[in-house]
Structures are given as structure tokens and as C-alpha cells.
């Protein structure tokens, strides 16, 4: 196993590093000789395998909740690095490390204002450094990653990130740069419709932050051109898309409380088999039995069908409506196949464990949980396949 010892510029003057155009952004690599720095006592061991997952979405679209569900599938709660910056955006568990791509902003809040660009604009982000560091982590090499401070809007000193078993990069641009995109083992896009996004933002910003309706509308409109140009097109590259739409069960519903959620799964993705309802490849419309699944108005409806999405063959599983009792979800789970669960009822168990998470009574929570289980299965298949390949190479 290779060993990498990582030092900051202050710790050691050395020419053995990869660097971007800014001298403060460096990835230090020491592969052969284990070293110990007495001041920092930093000895980093490379992970045997690191797989990289990309999660793209606009701000306020549920990325944080999704990450909490995903890390829970692998066990253990994700927390900021111990002893590090209290404003760090990074979350670390025993198996996963989640990096927020806001940390690769090249302009702080004041710089963006001066340059008249939003954080969605590629000119406000350092894709060279993003690529270098994601590649390094994927190859088992620790990095000194910058921190974007969401409280102050400034760029803080970097933090040391060690290579995990599973690296998740989440934010606005995980699939924007082709070099970064090619490093991903699996990718997800959260596609929230304009109507639902507006309803959610009103609920959050008016109720929790005291913003006016006019300011909320202005904020959404100001971001929309850059969102349409730089963020939304990434969904064509995603292996799975969770699409959140207004319900069709309530005519002219504008509140965004009852949702129609579609899980769009690309066919032919290595180590990933789409989930299906009843019969794979068929077109199914299903209203569950009211005696087995308690649902208040407007009820609940599932659909499943093969389809095409950006010229790719996909399978689409849809849920419209919401649950009243999560323990009854086992009835729905029993009719779904290819869930990649370890035991009967694992989806229901995961949903009950996080019943207080947003979306736990509708398709957003259900499909996030399912995708988390599929990612676990993908990871296990990847590791097993690489182990087999190594064994065959030695034979």
C-alpha cells in the first residue's frame, strides 16, 4: 500500500507537489518514504480504493438531506473534521467523505459582487484545482482543500482531506467540467421544477428568514439565466435523476406540499441496475390498496415505464402523493425489485430511521433512500471486481 505524507507550505519547503496557478492551492505528494513531521505529526495512508460520486443541484434543493440519507446507508453519522475549522463544509463518516464544491469558488462573495458574476458562473470557480484534487483523492492521495466560508463569504485557509472509501462531491458543478465528470463512478442530479422550487423557497425564506415575497422572486429571477446556462444542462450526464414536480392529484396546486417525484434511471450503467415495479420493462400504473396503505387526500399513485431521456434509454419510477404511515411502506417495498437491499424491509427501516428528515413522507425521501442503497451496491461490486482483477493479475 502506498503512503503519502502531506504538508502545508509552512510545514515544509519542497518541490514535490502539484500546484495550480495560485501558490496557496497545492496538492503535496510523498509516495515512497513514510515521514513524520514533528510539528504536525501527519502521516497519511492511502486508501485501497476510492470511488467518486457526484451530486448536482441548485442551492436549497435537498442536497444536504440526500447526503445524510446516503451516509446513513453506510453506517455512522457524517460530521465535520475533528479539530478543524468549525465553518468547514466537509462531512466525514467511517466510510464516506462529502465535499461541498462551493469550496472551489475562486472568487469570494465580495469578489463576485465586484466582478458582477454569481456563484453559478464558471468564472467564479476553480475547475483546475477541483479536477486536481478529486483525481488525487481518487488515486488515494490526501489533499489540502480550500474552504469557502458561508458565514463570512470569504475563502478560509485549507483543510487536510484524506482519501475515503467513498468520496461524494456535491454542489452546483460536479458534472460541468468534462475532466471532473470523467472521474465520477456514479452521478445524480436533483431536478426541482420551477414551481416547486419557488414554493419551497417561499416556505423557507419567508417563514424562517423573514424575506419578503418580492425579494424572493428577485433572487430566483437573478439566478435563473446562469442556472439555465450552467447547472441545468448537467442532468443530461447523470446516471440517475430525481425529478420533483407539482402533484397531478390536486388540480391547480401551487403550495408544493404534495409532490410528484420521478426517479429516472439510465440503462446500461456499469454496476447499476434500475429499480422496477412488478414487471421489468412494462408500463405500469398502480394505485395501492387503501386497506394496506393509509393515505389521506389526495391519495397516492405509482407509475413505471421505459422511456428516453436526452437520447438515452431509461427506466422511470414515479410516485405521486404521500404516505401517512411510514411503517406501511413495506407494502410498497414488497412490489419493487432490484432495490439492492441486504434484507427484506431495509428501505422501510431506513425511512423510519429518518422519519424527521424533509421528504420522508413522499417520493423524494423514498427515492433518495433507494439511490443510496444502489450506490452501496455499486461500491461493493466495484471493489469486488477490482479485487478479482488483482488476483487474476497475480495468478
Swiss-Prot record:
Residues 1-46 form a transit peptide. It is found in: Plastid, Chloroplast. InterPro entries: P-loop_NTPase, PRK, PRK/URK. It catalyses: D-ribulose 5-phosphate + ATP = D-ribulose 1,5-bisphosphate + ADP + H(+). Light regulated via thioredoxin by reversible oxidation/reduction of sulfhydryl/disulfide groups. Keywords: ATP-binding, Calvin cycle, Chloroplast, Disulfide bond, Kinase, Nucleotide-binding, Photosynthesis, Plastid, Transferase, Transit peptide. The keyword Nuclease does not apply. Pfam families: PRK. SUPFAM superfamilies: P-loop containing nucleoside triphosphate hydrolases. Belongs to the phosphoribulokinase family. Coiled coil: none annotated. This is Phosphoribulokinase, chloroplastic. One of its GO terms (biological process) is response to cold. It is an enzyme of class 2 (transferase). Its main location: plastid. Pathway: Carbohydrate biosynthesis; Calvin cycle. Disulfide bonds join 61-100. GO terms for molecular function: ATP binding; disordered domain specific binding; phosphoribulokinase activity; protein homodimerization activity. Its EC number is 2.7.1.19. GO terms for cellular component: apoplast; chloroplast; chloroplast envelope; chloroplast stroma; chloroplast thylakoid membrane; nucleus; stromule; supramolecular complex.
